[in-house]
């Protein structure tokens, strides 16, 4: 099952899950089908009878060009670019519980911070990046 399909092909839930992944310690790794928010490939599964092929769609160049125009994929690319360039992720992580199902993950150095505020029941989140130059809202 693809990660996107496991979340009901729900763009908001998928981006929230990927945002949490990007804010947890370590280097986030995303399989190519996940990078394109790919759905289960039931046709490939049926034709191959190989269970793991459900999440191994073989994209043509045309399909890739179409998929990268989807808002959920563009947002994921933007999130990953932020994760790869923000110096805050070189700092320390602080977890703050707000309420049941709501929390903030904040990475900070002396120069900058990046905060992910999450509300799991609504699939909503926001990211605030603070730099020496000022505040910048990412999502």
Question: In which residue ranges do the predicted regions lie?
Answer:
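Active-site and adjacent substrate-binding regions of carbohydrate-active enzymes
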Residues: 1-139
